[in-house]
Regions:
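Cross-family detector of peptidyl-prolyl cis-trans isomerase
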Residues: 3-6, 19-231
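Bacterial Sec-type N-terminal signal peptides, specifically the leucine/valine-rich hydrophobic h-region
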Residues: 13-16
């Protein structure tokens, strides 16, 4: 996991209200371009400390430190002396989340592999062909045009070309191993669901902020075409 890149910037977002000496009098508006930009800054910076998985009580403490820092109040602790402890907490919680996701993924894959009509590859991918295609099968070196939707095992969608309304085109050997192997089992015009073990997806690092460490992933894929290189 990357070292914390330091909290002077990362903490600066959890509560705009906490930065003010006055209590908030009305809901925060996010309508103008400037308001949207500063709101986005908050979201982006909060993602940098997502690994802490703060409890409500811890969030109050962070907000207190944030408000004191913004308002130039004297800190009640030595922030520099707390760096090592914060790093220790972040790493421990990151590992705990990874271990939990790994165990849940193993259970999910085991259950999925026992369903009727699926195939489990030697590498551990569980594939269900929901519509048989009639065209050619791609090779790993081919570019493919696909529609897809990716979900965590709790059903949360983290990426979807379907929602964007635009198919994706990419080299099949330039994506996660689960895709490289799984899509090669499909024919053009076909649809399939791929259940990807973490080691064939984004592994122990995940893909922050949308994919946690050691996450088993589910993809619904439609193979639209094999794209020929431009001459």
């Amino acid at each position: 996991m990357k070292k914390l890149n330091w909290l002077a910037a990362a903490l600066c977002t959890l509560s705009f209200a906490a930065c003010s000496k006055e209590p908030a009098q009305k809901p925060v508006e996010v309508t103008t371009d400037d308001q949207k930009a500063f709101y986005s800054l908050g979201v982006l910076m909060s993602q940098q400390i997502e690994s802490f998985t703060l409890t409500p009580e811890e969030l109050v403490l962070v907000q207190k430190g944030l408000a004191d820092g913004i308002n130039k109040a004297k800190p009640v602790t030595d922030p520099e002396a707390s760096k090592a402890k914060l790093q220790e907490i972040a790493q421990a919680r990151f590992k705990a989340a990874a271990d939990k996701a790994s165990a849940a993924g193993v259970e999910f894959l085991d259950k999925a592999s026992k369903e009727t009509g699926v195939v489990k590859t030697e590498s551990g991918i569980v594939i269900r062909h929901t519509k048989e295609g009639t065209g050619a099968k791609p090779a790993a070196t081919d570019q493919v045009k696909v529609h897809y939707e990716g979900r965590l095992i709790d059903g949360k969608v983290f990426d979807s070309s379907i929602q964007r309304g635009e198919p994706a085109t990419f080299p099949l050997n330039g994506v996660i191993p689960c895709w490289t192997e799984g899509v090669q089992t499909m024919k053009v015009g076909g649809k399939a669901q791929l259940v990807c073990p973490a080691n064939l997806a984004y592994g122990p690092n995940g893909s922050p902020p949308t994919i946690p460490p050691q996450a088993t992933l589910v993809f619904d894929v439609e193979l639209i075409d094999i794209v020929k290189p431009a001459k």
